[in-house]
Amino acid sequence: MKKRIGIVGAGTAGLHLGLFLRQHDVDVTVYTDRKPDEYSGLRLLNTVAHNAVTVQREVALDVNEWPSEEFGYFGHYYYVGGPQPMRFYGDLKAPSRAVDYRLYQPMLMRALEARGGKFCYDAVSAEDLEGLSEQYDLLVVCTGKYALGKVFEKQSENSPFEKPQRALCVGLFKGIKEAPIRAVTMSFSPGHGELIEIPTLSFNGMSTALVLENHIGSDLEVLAHTKYDDDPRAFLDLMLEKLGKHHPSVAERIDPAEFDLANSSLDILQGGVVPAFRDGHATLNNGKTIIGLGDIQATVDPVLGQGANMASYAAWILGEEILAHSVYDLRFSEHLERRRQDRVLCATRWTNFTLSALSALPPEFLAFLQILSQSREMADEFTDNFNYPERQWDRFSSPERIGQWCSQFAPTIAA
């Protein structure tokens, strides 16, 4: 008998899972409250970049609509402010790519539907889960909307924050000249905030995503509260002022006369994210085990861009486990967690560590930045390992590990 899987939520996790399962002739129904043709009129959803490992999964799923060789980026520029600013670069072994999710998500939905996936366009609440679970061999929940996140218990030991750690101002902009190599820029203004600049394909071609991770109480926090719609010129002038003061490696490539939101006033998001890590399964009153996937399991701040990438990875692993098993109970969830948890948990821990380290600047982290800025080999390794957060956490999970990693590259600098 053909397996029947219900998926609640049409984000990257749910759609990648659905596409994987349809490749293996598994019956898939996706529940979402948004149709593909509604996306173009929405506010900016996020500023997600897909790492090379995620792009490879898209190739395998036959949804690599925008090849990275043409639309992608090839490394990271780094800028660390201070009395003696540091500028350096790290290569990616294979290009990564960012596409406006208002283009990307409807493309995935249409591809899934064309391959036999079914969609039910309706809101699903926590109260609906028990009834839905009776209709499928397995129900997978991939969205935290409508209090669905409360169904999965938060793990306090992996959820150290009770409030947002950054005041975010995120937008798609035009008028920013590309660097000599098309790349992400990660700029750090100690005590004030971080900026991640991402070359991004949007409605009118290539644009620039600016992810401003402003420290709460700092000179930059005002960017999270000043509204573009109230006075566009005043907002843009404020942005130019703050970028020039805190993130000069990006500001120096801006044409003030052209600088503006890329498409419309819908191209900006402001607010904050409360990071959380939850159990990856829940048992309903009817005894059915349901699986949490993507943001509903691991909600991370966007500072390292790990959310969609680990969601895609976890979706692939879940797909493989669905194919390998026929009973979807608590033991099934244990098999799943054994395989997906290292990457998902390490991405969460590395992100949370980075938020804290960039605020507190402990001596071992400052030493890491100093050596990173002087060792191209280390910068290349660090940059490419954005693909592999478990490798990053192997390096950052204790001061001793950071020190040991730095010691590998310090002699090459001295030489």
Curated annotation (Swiss-Prot):
Catalytic function, reaction form: styrene + FADH2 + O2 = (S)-styrene oxide + FAD + H2O + H(+)
Top-level taxon: Bacteria
Single GO molecular function: monooxygenase activity
InterPro entries: FAD/NAD-bd_sf (IPR036188), StyA_sbd (IPR041654), StyMonoxStyA (IPR054801)
EC number, UniProt record: 1.14.14.11
Family matches, as Gene3D superfamilies: 3.30.9.40, 6.10.250.650, FAD/NAD(P)-binding domain
Keyword Flavoprotein: yes
Pathway(s) it belongs to: Aromatic compound metabolism
Keyword annotations: FAD, Flavoprotein, Monooxygenase, Oxidoreductase
Function: Styrene monooxygenase which catalyzes the first step in the aerobic styrene degradation pathway by enantioselective epoxidation of the vinyl side chain. In a two-component system, a reductase utilizes NADH to reduce FAD, which is then transferred to the oxygenase; the electron transfer is proposed to occur via a diffusing flavin.
Subunit text: Homodimer. A direct interaction with the monooxygenase reductase component StyB seems not to be necessary for the enzymatic activity.
Protein name: Styrene monooxygenase StyA
